């Protein structure tokens, strides 16, 4: 970062550690380096959540130092040069180039869209809608259709949609999602018709593998704690084994204590301090110590002092902060930056 020379001399730039720059910020810098048309061509292929994350990073990128911009450009070019040998398959080049530019999750989704196509554009259009609007669209549809929609969308959006349903219906849908393994082309065709889209023949003959225990657990992770507890209790009454399997796959804030030190350090770099402070207000001593030992001594002491001086806050505010940190952790896990270990052998 740039530092002012108190003697009025030349501004000195410190060395930039490219590994410490979040993926969204690197993507934002690269996109801002392009002309609007080229940047738009990339952005239009991103998923809604990805657009929000990268767009937010672009909005924040107002006072970037030339050193940081040059470091990102240099790292990008160095990565690209590794994959420009004549004779390399175009698919590998495309995938590796986009991974270098946008990060693994965004790049892989984009490559899949370009090379393979997504399953249903009718479903994709729902990702851009407000959860309450999606709920109003599917509320009177057959539970099978509702299940497909909720399984296909991002778990945080599905959780908000599920919260609009009556408790009995929400429980039924959650159990359907947990038991869903694949979707037949006829179901996708019916859903496309409902979405008023005409994509004849694009669904293909293969069944789409969506839903399942992991999908149900992910949705549960994003539900309000009260709703989550009620649904879990209702599920135990109906199918205790299924409820146990879902709970084993859920990752809650307290499970962060199982993340290795390197993962915690990476996570802390992406978590705003005010969010961390609120989240730790409701954390147990074991998790607090895990966090503190992965901060610098000075930062840990400051956080401890802030927590002691912090006035009482609403439980809902603490839970919201913890959910935000979990969302960041899941995103980093999806990018392969950290590994989250839950109650089961499977990792997120």
Swiss-Prot record:
Cell inner membrane among keywords: yes
Site positions (Part of the EHPQR-motif): 176
Single GO cellular component term: bacterial-type flagellum basal body
Pfam families hit by this protein: FliG_C, FliG_M, FliG_N
Protein localization: Cell inner membrane; Bacterial flagellum basal body
InterPro entries xrefs: Flg_Motor_Flig, Flg_Motor_Flig_C, FliG_a-hlx, FliG_M, FliG_N
Major localization class: membrane
Gene3D superfamilies membership: 1.10.220.30
GO terms for biological process, alphabetical: bacterial-type flagellum-dependent cell motility; chemotaxis
Record motif Part of the EHPQR-motif, residues: 141-144
PANTHER family in the cross-refs: FLAGELLAR MOTOR SWITCH PROTEIN FLIG
Functional note: FliG is one of three proteins (FliG, FliN, FliM) that forms the rotor-mounted switch complex (C ring), located at the base of the basal body. This complex interacts with the CheY and CheZ chemotaxis proteins, in addition to contacting components of the motor that determine the direction of flagellar rotation.
Identification of the protein by name: Flagellar motor switch protein FliG
Organism for this UniProt entry: Vibrio cholerae serotype O1 (strain ATCC 39315 / El Tor Inaba N16961)
Gene responsible for this protein: fliG
């Amino acid at each position: 970062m740039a530092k002012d020379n108190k003697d009025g001399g030349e501004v000195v730039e410190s060395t930039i550690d490219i590994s410490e720059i979040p993926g969204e910020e690197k993507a934002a810098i690269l996109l801002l380096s392009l002309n609007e048309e080229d940047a738009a061509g990339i952005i239009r292929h991103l998923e809604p959540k990805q657009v929000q994350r990268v767009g937010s990073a672009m909005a924040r990128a107002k006072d970037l130092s030339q050193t940081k911009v040059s470091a990102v450009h240099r790292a990008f070019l160095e990565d690209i040069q590794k994959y420009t040998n004549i004779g390399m398959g175009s698919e590998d080049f495309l995938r590796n180039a986009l991974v270098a530019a946008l990060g693994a999750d965004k790049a892989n989704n984009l490559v899949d869209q370009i090379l393979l196509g997504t399953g249903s554009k009718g479903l994709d259009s729902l990702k851009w809608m407000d959860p309450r609007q999606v709920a109003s669209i599917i509320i009177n549809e057959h539970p099978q259709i509702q299940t497909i929609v909720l399984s296909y969308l991002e778990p945080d959006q599905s959780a908000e949609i599920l919260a609009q349903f009556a408790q009995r219906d929400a429980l039924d849908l959650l159990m359907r999602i947990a038991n869903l393994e694949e979707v037949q082309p006829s179901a996708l065709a019916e859903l496309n018709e409902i979405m008023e889209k005409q994509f004849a023949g694009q669904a293909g003959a293969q069944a789409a593998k969506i839903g399942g225990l992991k999908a149900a657990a992910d949705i549960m992770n994003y539900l309000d704690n009260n709703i989550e507890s009620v649904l879990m209790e209702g599920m135990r009454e109906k199918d205790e084994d299924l409820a146990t399997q879902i709970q084993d796959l859920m990752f809650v804030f307290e499970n962060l204590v199982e993340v290795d030190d390197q993962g915690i350090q990476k996570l802390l770099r992406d978590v705003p301090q005010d969010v961390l402070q609120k989240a730790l207000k409701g954390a147990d001593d074991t998790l607090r110590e895990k966090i503190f030992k992965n901060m610098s001594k000075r930062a840990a002491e400051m956080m401890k002092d802030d927590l002691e001086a912090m006035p009482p806050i609403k439980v809902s505010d603490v839970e919201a902060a913890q959910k935000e940190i979990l969302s960041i952790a899941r995103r980093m896990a999806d990018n392969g930056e950290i590994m989250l270990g839950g109650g089961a052998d499977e990792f997120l």
